[in-house]
Amino acid sequence: QNPTNDAVAAKICALEGGSAAMLTSSGQAANFFALFNIAEAGDHVVASSTIYGGTFNLIAHTMRKMGIECTFVAPNASLEELDAAFRPNTKAVFGETIANPALAVLDIETFAQAAHDHGVPLIVDNTFPTPVNCRPIEWGADIVTHSTTKYMDGHGCGVGGAIVDAGRFDWMAQGDRFP
């Protein structure tokens, strides 16, 4: 426990409208923890194809080396296109509110509907807009991540990340899917 970290996490949580939050050592660590606490070898995730390059590499390469597959879809994919990307072993959907550096905007509501229709959580990286400009939980996200190094820090002097849980996803309702 670190009271300073706890205070910052609580502030970010309140700004996002979440139920709980934690800080990480970086934004990449936040995305890593959010994904790897849900998916494991043999699992699959669906992700927006337009995301920060480091996160794309995490999902497309590092996760694949660890036995987790991914299907990428456009950030404005239709519900039908999203549904086609799911597999029986899909564990999560990932996207970025506003992609860095492409500035493509994620259709959070459609991604949330697809994720929830398939019984999996939607994870949204909200680094670019921060909760000052967009609160993904209000649009259906279950988990929100941040690189606090970017806009929250102001100019990259401090490295950090955050994970916010909306507190609404019913993990127990999915049976053995999320032990």
Task: Describe the residue ranges of each PLM region.
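Aromatic- and Gly/Pro-rich amphipathic surface segment
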Residues: 1-16
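Conserved PLP-enzyme active-site core in the AAT-like
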Residues: 21-179
